[in-house]
Amino acid sequence: MNQITDKYPTCEITIQGKKFKGLVDTGVDISIISLQHWPSTWSIHPAQFNIVGVGKAPEVYQSSYILHCEGPNGQRGTIQPIITSVPINLWGRDLLQ
């Protein structure tokens, strides 16, 4: 497991037209978006799994939908992120596919 520090590069991703900044190359498989950054109008449901390595998260959700996203250089893709109480968004391997 990698320790998350300020040495990781950041990247801004646009999801459904909303910009999110997060850390890249953190070792997570599925991207994690901070609950405080997640729009309250976007649907979520309780995740059917636990997350490991980012501390003890009391509430773990997942986006109810697969969302369209765009990288900083116009790369297009889809994402169904995890949403929980982390201090910063963590971009995972799911965005590298």
Per-range role (PLM):
Residues 1-3:
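Short glycine- and acidic-rich boundary segments immediately preceding or forming the N-terminal edge
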